[in-house]
Amino acid sequence: MDEVLNLAKKAKEASKKLAQLSTEQKNRALLKIAQYLEENMEKILTENQKDLAEAKKGGLSPAFIERLTLNEKRILDMAEGVRQVAKLPDPVGEVLGMTRRPNGLVIGQVRVPLGVVGIIYESRPNVTVDAAALCLKAGNAVILRGGKEAFNSNLALVTLMEEALRSEEIPEGAVGMIKTTSRDAANYLMRLNGYLDVLIPRGGAGLIKTVVENSTVPVIETGVGNCHVYVEEDADLEMAERIIINAKCQRPAVCNAMETLLVHEKIAPVFLPQIGKALKENGVEIRGCEVTRRYIPDALPATEEDYYTEFLDLILAVRVVRDLDEAIAHITKYGSGHSEAIVTRDYFKARRFTEEVDAAAVYVNASTRFTDGFEFGFGAEIGISTQKLHARGPMGLKELTTTKYVIYGTGQIRG
């Protein structure tokens, strides 16, 4: 475990220097990272092909392979994402408030970096670049531990970023990667109090549960996305169909994709055959309740477990509900607090849904797929938090900072 400890020591030392960098220095480094990604595309793709070959040989699912895959467009998108982070306002040093006390003390609250951020994530190489860019802009050092299936891709990306940062004289250790796939290394990282300030897991329920239960470092839990769309009796059904197809089919392997569809019983006879046909045309396997199967005969029977499941695939659980009360009760029981949507024309039902559904993002007449840092205007995101402390929802730059109080006096002492 010496490698992990040395990485953490370098990151801790680098974090002190990163906190003092100017916005201009950080932006130059980010632009250099983007340049290196574009100039070394073939090298990245070659390493990614090694990972893909192993994944296919290991019989991993098409959805998993889709998340693992890099191509020219995705690398260009990564580079553009880094440039977008460079364009974002620097949160470090922002003065959040200033007050003068009756005794003359001036008390200010200032935004500062978290310090050293550890990220344990599954096999999505884009997370490697997004996380490094965001942490750098927020003045943090970062230690990355990606999934073993993306090891070659991640190593290529981190090596290029290290070269880019070195050329801009950014401290060594600003971006580090655990260069082993050993679980022991990940477990050791989780216990590095005093070196890591926060640990962020990104991935499926199993990974997140492991980190939350075993880490002694403070954790920001990025959540499982068991997301729902509820179609009310007064909904515009054409709009509902567009939203459902987008939320389920556009990119099913991501956490903001819909996993369960809830339909009001009064529109079920008309809407379920319509949406069932559209979903089938998009290759979706439907698992429905008894009423659902009456109107979509080829739907499979849904189990209790299906309603708890984040499928991350072209599989959808469907349930017919009596009313808004039952829809909210279902979401409360089975939902993961990520993203929930209602399709309705009724303002009061929409308002009640937004007030009573406890989730990081609650939508009225829109797809859950918008729960994303770019779509919210934050730039790239470090993850989507489903907890309430220290952040909730898409975590951008500000969520990678904390605050401290700076107090100016003229010799005051406390009586």
Curated annotation (Swiss-Prot):
<keyword id="KW-0560">Oxidoreductase</keyword>
<comment type="similarity">
    <text>Belongs to the gamma-glutamyl phosphate reductase family.</text>
</comment>
<keyword id="KW-0028">Amino-acid biosynthesis</keyword>
<dbReference type="GO" id="GO:0005737">
    <property type="term" value="C:cytoplasm"/>
</dbReference>
<dbReference type="InterPro" id="IPR016162">
    <property type="entry name" value="Ald_DH_N"/>
</dbReference>
<dbReference type="Pfam" id="PF00171">
    <property type="entry name" value="Aldedh"/>
</dbReference>
<keyword id="KW-0963">Cytoplasm</keyword>
<protein>
    <recommendedName>
        <fullName>Gamma-glutamyl phosphate reductase</fullName>
        <ecNumber>1.2.1.41</ecNumber>
    </recommendedName>
</protein>
<dbReference type="InterPro" id="IPR012134">
    <property type="entry name" value="Glu-5-SA_DH"/>
</dbReference>
<keyword id="KW-0521">NADP</keyword>
<keyword id="KW-0641">Proline biosynthesis</keyword>
<comment type="function">
    <text>Catalyzes the NADPH-dependent reduction of L-glutamate 5-phosphate into L-glutamate 5-semialdehyde and phosphate. The product spontaneously undergoes cyclization to form 1-pyrroline-5-carboxylate.</text>
</comment>
<dbReference type="GO" id="GO:0004350">
    <property type="term" value="F:glutamate-5-semialdehyde dehydrogenase activity"/>
</dbReference>
<dbReference type="InterPro" id="IPR016163">
    <property type="entry name" value="Ald_DH_C"/>
</dbReference>
<dbReference type="InterPro" id="IPR015590">
    <property type="entry name" value="Aldehyde_DH_dom"/>
</dbReference>
<dbReference type="InterPro" id="IPR016161">
    <property type="entry name" value="Ald_DH/histidinol_DH"/>
</dbReference>
<comment type="pathway">
    <text>Amino-acid biosynthesis; L-proline biosynthesis; L-glutamate 5-semialdehyde from L-glutamate: step 2/2.</text>
</comment>
<dbReference type="InterPro" id="IPR000965">
    <property type="entry name" value="GPR_dom"/>
</dbReference>
<dbReference type="GO" id="GO:0055129">
    <property type="term" value="P:L-proline biosynthetic process"/>
</dbReference>
<dbReference type="GO" id="GO:0050661">
    <property type="term" value="F:NADP binding"/>
</dbReference>
<dbReference type="InterPro" id="IPR020593">
    <property type="entry name" value="G-glutamylP_reductase_CS"/>
</dbReference>
